[in-house]
Swiss-Prot record:
Catalytic activity: butanoate + ATP = butanoyl phosphate + ADP
Top-tier EC class: transferase
Statement: the UniProt record of this protein carries the keyword Coiled coil: no
Gene Ontology CC annotation, any one: cytoplasm
Sequence similarity: Belongs to the acetokinase family.
Record-given protein name: Probable butyrate kinase
UniProt lineage: Bacteria, Thermotogati, Deinococcota, Deinococci, Deinococcales
Keyword set includes NADP: no
Length: 383
């Protein structure tokens, strides 16, 4: 039995789309490891999604996907819904309205449109007569209570990290080392424009460095850890919004080398004569290794795998340095780029195939509907 999901992932310059054919896996020992075949397309945008309007954007998606096989569900990238457990969520008009109205003003450079995935998925799903889902939204929070605490009463560490991609990579890494995701310990380092390093224990992200502007090693544009007094001095010369932009978009390799183009930085590194690039790479590797060590220590035992993902994981020279330094920790699994389209499709597939229950969200809390094969849903009101 196969299922079809239409996948919607809004980005900086366009909307990534995919038609996913989802089938049960071939290994009965790993029933949740699905086989997913994606047909990918991109809908380029000449203006920001909020300027185009959600109705117009949904119409363009419907036009571009009109020739695709009819879906069993539409799945989009999630938004900020308060602190919620990981999983696949049924998109209702109430949820779609909430994520549109609760968009943080300090989104990192690689997460510009966190509020539109759910309402877009709902509009397209309503037109197709199928349910809409989101998977592992940005505000997933399953951290240990002590991981939230700081030494200052009232100041709390938040759980903002690359939840969708990191969980998908952790699942894949567990499978690669022969472990069920809900039995494995995995450390995932997402290395890209922004970064985060996260410890997964038995299917839960129990601790994380966070990502810009709250934490994580330096990235292509992310600052990495800063001394507190330096941040205080910076606030004396610029506004909060200016400082947030500096920490999330104007720092890291971009500030140190003059470019965030990783292929250009790699070219300069290979020439071996650019001391600025060599020093920046050394600092990056040092910070990533420290962060992996920190998250390893958050686990109740040795990890089964360390996984590297994100755009910088394509950079062999950097990956080799990290692996050599930390080879003693656990086997390394390298999954370059991002698996967001696959993660969205797989999350919908686990629900459609009855392998996992679907979560229902309201402002008052989250409930889990028991796992069951897909059933027809009733028509819901417009957002």
């Amino acid at each position: 039995m196969s299922m079809i999901a239409h996948v919607i992932n809004p980005g900086i310059s366009g909307v990534k789309l995919a038609c996913a054919v989802i089938e049960p896996g071939q290994n009965p020992a790993f029933p949740s490891h699905l086989q997913v075949s994606l047909t990918r397309e991109e809908l380029p945008l000449e203006a920001a999604p909020d300027e185009l309007g959600l109705d117009a954007l949904a119409e363009r998606i419907l036009e571009q996907t009109a020739a695709w096989p009819a879906p069993d569900a539409v799945v989009g990238r999630g938004g900020l819904m308060g602190r919620v457990p990981a999983g696949t969520y049924h998109v209702t008009p109430e949820l779609a309205r909430y994520v549109l109205e609760n968009v943080s003003g300090s989104q990192p450079a690689d997460d510009p449109n966190p509020g539109i995935g759910a309402p877009l998925a709902l509009r397209v799903a309503q037109a197709r007569g199928v349910p809409a889902y989101i998977v592992d939204p940005q505000s997933v929070d399953e951290l240990l209570p002590e991981a939230h605490m700081t030494g200052v009463p009232g100041v709390r560490r938040e759980a903002r990290f690359h939840a969708l991609n990191a969980r998908a990579v952790a699942r894949r890494a567990a499978y690669e080392v022969g472990k069920q995701f809900r039995e494995a310990r995995v450390v995932v380092a997402h290395l890209g424009v922004t970064t985060s390093v996260t410890a997964f224990d038995q299917g839960r992200a129990i601790d994380t460095t966070g990502t810009a502007p709250d934490g994580g090693p330096m990235g292509a544009r992310q600052s990495g850890p800063l001394p507190t007094r330096a941040v205080i001095r910076l606030l004396q010369t610029q506004s909060e919004s200016e400082l947030l932009r500096l920490l999330t978009r104007g720092s890291g390799f971009f500030a140190l080398t003059g470019t965030a183009d990783l292929s250009e930085i790699e070219r300069r590194q290979e020439q071996g004569e650019d001391s600025v690039v060599q020093t920046a790479i050394a600092a990056f590797v040092h910070q990533v290794c420290k962060a992996i060590g920190e998250q390893t220590a958050a686990l109740p035992g040795r990890p089964d795998a360390v996984a590297l993902t994100g755009g910088i994981a394509r950079w062999d020279a950097v990956v080799d340095r990290i692996e050599r330094r930390l080879a003693w920790v656990a086997p390394f699994i390298v999954l370059p780029g991002e698996l967001e389209l696959e993660a969205l499709a797989e999350g919908a597939g686990r629900v459609l195939l009855g392998l996992e229950g679907v979560r229902e969200w309201t402002p008052e809390g989250v409930t889990l509907r028991p796992a069951a094969p897909l059933v027809q849903v009733e028509t819901v009101e417009e957002v």
